[in-house]
Every structure is written in structure tokens, then in C-alpha cells.
Curated annotation (Swiss-Prot):
<dbReference type="InterPro" id="IPR029055">
    <property type="entry name" value="Ntn_hydrolases_N"/>
</dbReference>
<dbReference type="GO" id="GO:0004298">
    <property type="term" value="F:threonine-type endopeptidase activity"/>
</dbReference>
<dbReference type="InterPro" id="IPR023332">
    <property type="entry name" value="Proteasome_alpha-type"/>
</dbReference>
<protein>
    <recommendedName>
        <fullName>Proteasome subunit alpha</fullName>
    </recommendedName>
</protein>
<comment type="function">
    <text>Component of the proteasome core, a large protease complex with broad specificity involved in protein degradation.</text>
</comment>
<dbReference type="GO" id="GO:0005737">
    <property type="term" value="C:cytoplasm"/>
</dbReference>
<comment type="subunit">
    <text>The 20S proteasome core is composed of 14 alpha and 14 beta subunits that assemble into four stacked heptameric rings, resulting in a barrel-shaped structure. The two inner rings, each composed of seven catalytic beta subunits, are sandwiched by two outer rings, each composed of seven alpha subunits. The catalytic chamber with the active sites is on the inside of the barrel. Has a gated structure, the ends of the cylinder being occluded by the N-termini of the alpha-subunits. Is capped at one or both ends by the proteasome regulatory ATPase, PAN.</text>
</comment>
<dbReference type="InterPro" id="IPR000426">
    <property type="entry name" value="Proteasome_asu_N"/>
</dbReference>
<dbReference type="Pfam" id="PF10584">
    <property type="entry name" value="Proteasome_A_N"/>
</dbReference>
<dbReference type="Pfam" id="PF00227">
    <property type="entry name" value="Proteasome"/>
</dbReference>
<keyword id="KW-0647">Proteasome</keyword>
<dbReference type="InterPro" id="IPR050115">
    <property type="entry name" value="Proteasome_alpha"/>
</dbReference>
<dbReference type="InterPro" id="IPR001353">
    <property type="entry name" value="Proteasome_sua/b"/>
</dbReference>
<dbReference type="GO" id="GO:0019773">
    <property type="term" value="C:proteasome core complex, alpha-subunit complex"/>
</dbReference>
<dbReference type="GO" id="GO:0006511">
    <property type="term" value="P:ubiquitin-dependent protein catabolic process"/>
</dbReference>
<comment type="similarity">
    <text>Belongs to the peptidase T1A family.</text>
</comment>
<dbReference type="GO" id="GO:0010498">
    <property type="term" value="P:proteasomal protein catabolic process"/>
</dbReference>
Amino acid sequence: MQQGQMAYDRAITVFSPDGRLFQVEYAREAVKKGSTALGIKFKDGVALISEKKVRSRLVEKTSLEKIQLIDDRVAAVTSGLVADARVLIDFARISDQQEKVTYGSLMNIENLVKRVADQMQQYTQYGGVRPYGVSIIFAGLDSIGPRLFDCDPAGTINEYKCVSIGAGKDQVTAYLEKEYKENLSEDEAIRMGIAALKSAVADESSMKEPEIASIKMGETFHVFTSEEVSKYLN
């Protein structure tokens, strides 16, 4: 570590002379060590796909859920520190339900993402805390149609047609930039997403049973069963 950098990475609220917040950069590095996942829009919906790393044969595979439902029309996939991800997913669910109790309807997906991003951003500017070491892809439907957002440790939000997070982000992004076309069918989008993940994942065993979930207009989010996933792996 450079001597000049050491003076500015001890406190999260201190900028370096060149305008960097080192603790936020370190949080992004934690995300780069996480599982690779992606979101991809298709003609009338959006899908989430994630590799599934099983560190030991003693682990129950059913306990390793990367894709989380926020409600029946919004889901999220995370990469980075698992505990941080759990806290933020719970925060999103509680915020969503509070909106329903207060106003009689669930929160618009864009507002929900902004609420989570605000929470993440707050942890980049107060002493005594650290940034969340996780990035989240949110996918769902609203009155506009299929929506797909990415939120990083700094609380930055972007909306995409397709997006990736995790260790293989750069390779997946390069693949999708070359191959992605609008108005794909659900089947085409899922097959493209799996191909993109396979191009980036070093451990082939993590793609033996990836997690997949999708939602189409007029329907609710569907998490694919093992049998449904297997047809995309042949």
C-alpha cells in the first residue's frame, strides 16, 4: 500500500487528494470476489441468472439461494458479502411492506431501488460504519414494463437492458455487448444468459445447476425448479 494512500483509507469520510474514497473502492473489490450473476430483459419480461457455488459437499444446496424475491413482482440477485446482502434484502422487503401498510399498495420498483441505494449511500459518509460490500441487481415489472437496475456499494443506480455483477462481470458484459438483441424470447434470453455465464466462470461445477428466475407481463416471478433449469444446460 502506498504511504499516501494509507493516510486516507482509515476513515470512510475522508477523501484522498485525487477525490477517492478508498473504503468504497475496497467494498467494490469485495463484490469482484463474489459469485457471477446477471439480469437480462426479453420481449415481455426480465430474467435473473446466477452461478451457484457449493464450497463443500456437506452443504445443503437448498440453503444457498442467490436469487431472492422481494415480493411477487420484484426479485433481486446479489454478489459480494452474503451477510451484507441478507441485511439489504430484508431492508428492501420491509420497506416494500411498509409502503403497502401505509398507502395500500406495494412500492414502485424504481422507488424501491432508490430506497435501498439511499441506505447504501449513507454508509459511505458517516464515521463508525463501513460500506456494504455487495452489489445488487433488481428486476421486475411496473406500468412502464420490464425494469432492470444495478446498485453498487456507493449507492449508485443504473438501469440496463442486461447487466452483470460479480467476479466474471467483465467477461459477461463483453459477451452480452456482442450478442444481445432486443425483443428476445424468454427462452432465447435465458440461453444467452447461461452462455454468457459459462464464458466467464472458471469453476464449471458452479454452472451445473445455476439459479434462474423470470417474470413476464401479467404474471408473477417464477423461480425455476431443478428440472426446468436442466433443459437449458443440454
